[in-house]
Amino acid sequence: MIDVCFARGRWNPSEWLKFKSLRFDYAHDFVQLDDCIVNPSDPKWSDEELYAQHVTEVYASMVHPQKLSGSTIDVSATMSFDHLMAPLIVLTPELDVDDKGRHAFKKHYEVVLYNEGLNVWHYTYEGGKLSWHLAAFARAPFEPKRKYELKVNMAKVAGRDEMRMTVECGGVKFGFEDPDLPESFYAGVTGCEGRNRFYDFKARTGDRALDPAADGEH
């Protein structure tokens, strides 16, 4: 069980691993505010200026070092975005590093909240090259500067050799199955493409596999 509040003095940053994207040659720390953490940006930038001119400069990510495994895994984070996008929960099966020894995402999933919906991006890494595609999505309006709890459930489907991901946020719920979904992984949060605030993070595991029939599958 992981249960972290990101308010000032309520958590220990040294218990988390700072991660970078292979698309950028930097690794930023989050900035501590009274009630949350936020990815770094120049306060002189307006939201519109940040999005138009500095979107590649504000990436920050961290992962909890406790590996999650079980027939069912629940991960959630309370988050908000100031403008258009794009706070997310990240799931990575390994604690990979780049060629300089810095923690960096290779194969992983991103579950993203933004003003027009929810996206699940699947990243792969082969031959030294990072690539990605949109694995699942839902379109719905989400408001800036409003707190949302983004929930991700990963469940092993009984009788099948694969996992199902279910995403829920703001009354929107969807899911999908994919043989590439990991049965065990590390989880964390990423702020990017705008000012993103994170208020808490939770994760828990269980041993009950998903019964497709009981879940409405026919």
Positions of PLM-derived features:
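Beta-strand-rich interaction surfaces with strong enrichment in secreted/lumenal proteins
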Residues: 60-67, 135-142, 188
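Short tryptophan-centered beta-strand motifs in secreted/extracellular beta-sheet-rich domains
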Residues: 75-77, 145-159, 165-167
